A protein has these predicted regions:
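Cleavable N-terminal export/targeting peptides
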Residues: 1-28
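Short loop/turn motifs that connect adjacent beta-strands in outer-membrane beta-barrel proteins
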Residues: 20-30, 44-45, 60-70, 95-101, ...
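Transmembrane beta-strand segments that form the barrel wall of outer-membrane beta-barrel proteins
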Residues: 32-41, 67-79, 102-109, 144-148
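Solvent-exposed loop/turn segments connecting transmembrane beta-strands
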Residues: 40-50, 76-87, 114-121, 151-159
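Outer-membrane beta-barrel "beta-signal"
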Residues: 48-54, 132, 157-170
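Residue-level signature of outer-membrane beta-barrel architecture
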Residues: 56-58, 92-94, 132, 146, ...
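Helix-adjacent hinge/juxtasegments
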Residues: 81-105
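Mid-chain, well-packed structural core segment of small domains
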Residues: 99-126
Length: 170
């Protein structure tokens, strides 16, 4: 087989798998990463603790529903008392001009470390976040959340936390 025939055959085979520049620019590769810090269980004087955490959101997986634009989120936090929480769940986003309102619900796994005993390994985080667009690719926000085991354990004290958030889109 000569080289010319080989090139023609390879071109025909690979043509359906190629994309041109116009198609590539229409594909949105937007992902959001946020870091946050705040106060874990601020309403309990005996067990409140500072926290730091991160969260990832992939906009390519979002869905428009009757509840709004929903997308999956995954993240983790750790407190100064070595308590930790890893989670994954869903958030909705509502925009009013430069303001963003983002409620979320994320089940996860909690480890108390030297911090507050929340009564169970499985905890549910309900959160409301308000943020302001700083630029096309960044936001600054404030959020409040409640962590609870929904009475899965013998006790369910819950924890209320607030955080300051910085978001960066990539």
């Amino acid at each position: 087989m000569n080289l010319k025939k080989l090139i023609i055959i390879l071109t025909i085979i690979l043509m359906p798998f190629s994309s041109n520049a116009e198609e590539s620019t229409n594909i949105d590769q937007y992902t959001q990463f946020s870091v946050y810090t705040g106060m874990f269980d601020f309403s309990d004087d005996g067990k409140k603790s500072t926290l730091i955490g991160f969260q990832h959101q992939n906009e390519n997986l979002n869905r428009d529903t009757f509840l709004g634009n929903l997308s999956p989120v995954t993240g983790a936090l750790i407190t100064a008392d070595n308590a930790g929480y890893i989670y994954t769940g869903v958030q909705a986003q509502y925009k009013i001009g430069a303001l963003n309102f983002t409620p979320s619900f994320t089940p996860g796994l909690y480890h108390e470390g030297n911090g507050k005993d929340l009564g169970h390994l499985i905890e549910f985080k309900s959160e409301l976040q308000i943020s302001l667009d700083l630029s096309k690719n960044s936001e600054l926000g404030f959020s409040y959340n409640h962590l609870s085991n929904a009475s899965l354990g013998d006790k369910n004290p819950g924890a209320n936390s607030y955080m300051f958030n910085f978001f960066k889109n990539f």
